[in-house]
Curated annotation (Swiss-Prot):
InterPro entries, sorted: Mcrtin_ACTH_cent, Melanocortin_N, Opioid_neuropept, PMOC, POMC-derived_peptides
Protein name: Pro-opiomelanocortin
Modification sites for Pyrrolidone carboxylic acid: 23
Modified residues (Valine amide): 147
Signal sequence annotation: 1-22
Any one GO molecular-function label of the UniProt entry: hormone activity
Record's compositionally biased regions (Basic and acidic residues): 128-142
Location of the protein in the cell: Secreted
Organism: Lepisosteus osseus (Long-nosed gar)
Record's GO cellular component terms: extracellular region
Domain of life: Eukaryota
Length: 259
């Protein structure tokens, strides 16, 4: 009992200090502070006056003063009724509920300035994020303004003027420089391509279709199949067999002479 009264008194003192003047004592609820219910009613009255003095912004419903129905519901909900007095088990819970209500009212009285600052900071941060997002979308896509001037690639001229920039020359002089360049003649290019074409034609005549015989999916020539072991008797060389017969005949002749 004493603990709850001290909690209520502390909350009332904080509210009076926050208000800055003795307007809370003018209420009829604050004249009699002998019971917990009167202290709770006084704290709620002071809290309602403080919230009524704070500016009301759209979208900040928690900063608006509570309605009369909400006040009555809070008073009837947290008040220790006759049912709580009759039941021994609910007495402690009603006291704890009263203390929690006083603490919640105390925190609510202290919260509005901080909540207002947090709301302002959150609104400023959200606005900054929206601006950053908009600037990114405007600069990132084609219809937005580019970040900076695009750098043009450096042009290199083969006639020794690469040290000087191309912007130093007007358009006519640049055309003259390009006309003075020694490009290979078309006849020389055709001759080089003609030599390559002759080599390709010889390869095609030698191995048949170049595309069919050059890649893996084409059949290899007969002389290269299986390493040359699958040749016919006519295609194989007859020299080893003839050399063998010759050696046998010579050996037989030497043996006959020795006999």
């Amino acid at each position: 009992m004493l603990r709850s009264v001290w909690v209520y008194s502390l909350g009332l003192a904080v509210l009076l200090q926050q208000s800055g003047r003795e307007q809370c004592w003018e209420h009829s609820q604050c004249r009699d502070l002998s019971s917990e219910e009167n202290i709770l009613e006084c704290i709620q009255a002071c809290n309602s006056d403080l919230t009524a003095e704070s500016p009301i912004f759209p979208g900040n419903g928690h900063l608006q003063p509570p309605s009369e129905a909400d006040r009555n519901y809070a008073k009837s909900h947290f008040r220790s009724t006759a049912l709580g007095r009759r039941t021994n088990g609910s007495v402690g819970s009603s006291k704890q509920a009263g203390e929690n209500a006083a603490l919640s009212i105390l925190f609510a009285a202290l919260a509005p300035p901080q909540a207002e600052e947090e709301m302002e900071e959150s609104e400023s941060s959200q606005q900054q994020r929206r601006e950053d997002k908009r600037s990114y979308s405007m600069e990132h896509f084609r219809w937005g303004k580019p970040v900076g001037r695009k750098r043009r690639p450096v042009k290199v001229y083969p006639n020794g003027v690469e040290e000087e920039s191309a912007e130093a020359y007007p358009t006519e002089m640049r055309r003259d420089l390009m006309s003075d360049l020694d490009y290979p003649l078309l006849e020389e290019v055709e001759e080089e391509l003609g030599g390559e074409n002759e080599v390709l034609n010889l390869q095609e005549k030698k191995d048949g279709s170049y595309k069919m015989h050059h890649f893996r999916w084409s059949r290899p020539p007969k002389d290269k199949r299986y390493g040359g072991f699958m040749k016919s008797w006519d295609e194989r060389s007859q020299k080893p067999l003839l050399t063998l017969f010759k050696n046998v005949i010579i050996k037989d002749g030497h043996q006959k002479k020795g006999q």
